[in-house]
Amino acid sequence: MKVTIAQIAKAAGVSPGSVSNALNNRKGTISEQKREHIIRIAEQLGYFKKGKRTGIISLVLYDAGETIVQTDQPFFSALIRGMEEGCHQYDYQLRIRKVRSDDQKAIETLDNISESDGLLVMGTEMHFKDVEKFRHFKIPFVIVDNAYIMENCDFVAINNKDGMYEVTKLLIDKGYTKIGLINSLRMINNFKERKLGFLQALADHDLSFNGDDEIFVEPHIEEGTKDFSRFLHQQKELGILLPEAFVAMNDYIALASLRAMKEEGIPIPVVGFDDIEMARYSEPSLTTVRVNKEDLGKIAVGRLIAKFE
């Protein structure tokens, strides 16, 4: 017997209209908490029949506590926009949910989401051990914005190492020989790959790297500015010369360091990574590695759909 919206509404303790809004993913009509409650009740009642396409893809925001993945930040909003456009092209809806890395039960539940045909996992904060939790999922999935060498997993990510190599080489070609690295206090795999590219570029041009020229800051503009300002004051008090140029792990860090140096009247060039929109309007201007976030999102959707169609 087919489960009705009225039955779901009664079991969930909500109105039929709320059930309809939840099942049709109408944004802004009900809270995310209520939507997830309704979907959970619908699943328990057997509303979603296994073996049939639902026309829905779930985007899983994987939270490992690094505060990197924030959907209101330009990089991730553009990436998600690309996913939404990709889903629209294939006549799918995108539903967003969030899981914490320490919530093993919630992670295991993802493998049995009968409302979704597949998962796009925002893996920016995922470490190797986190990816291991998904390896044997039966539901099709693709991990986005991260990559490891691992069987039974599909990844869609940019080449972080090569991108950082090229932007570092750009500074070297301009004649800079003492180049500092502005790293993140929140370490993720993408940043590790970028550091490898940075070091490789220096090594290929017979340039050494002084560990004292690696600065760690929060990967957000406000906190990063304060961190970099403290570094500048410390170096000044100790009488230590600053590098001739800096490479930053991403544009947020680059913009933070530029702001701090502008306040101190220090005109040292900085290059960034990701090409977020606000970087185009920075003063002084910021050279950065261009990343087509929307295309990355569309490619991820195409890769996922190819796994089950």
Per-segment meaning from a language model:
Residues 1-54:
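N-terminal helix-turn-helix DNA-binding module of bacterial transcription factors
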Residues 20, 53-69, 178-184:
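Short beta-strand segments enriched in small/hydrophobic residues
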Residues 41, 82-86, 133, 193-205, ...:
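Alpha-helical structural signal in soluble globular domains
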Residues 48, 88-93, 140, 177, ...:
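Residue-level detector of anion-binding/catalytic polar loops
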Residues 56-169, 173, 232-241, 245, ...:
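Alpha-helical recognition/docking segments in bacterial nutrient-uptake
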Residues 65-75, 96-104, 156-166, 182-230, ...:
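Hinge/beta->alpha junction and helix N-cap segments in small-molecule ligand-binding domains
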Residues 115-117, 175-178, 210, 242, ...:
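Short loop/turn motifs at secondary-structure junctions
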Residues 229, 233-309:
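Flexible loop/turn connectors
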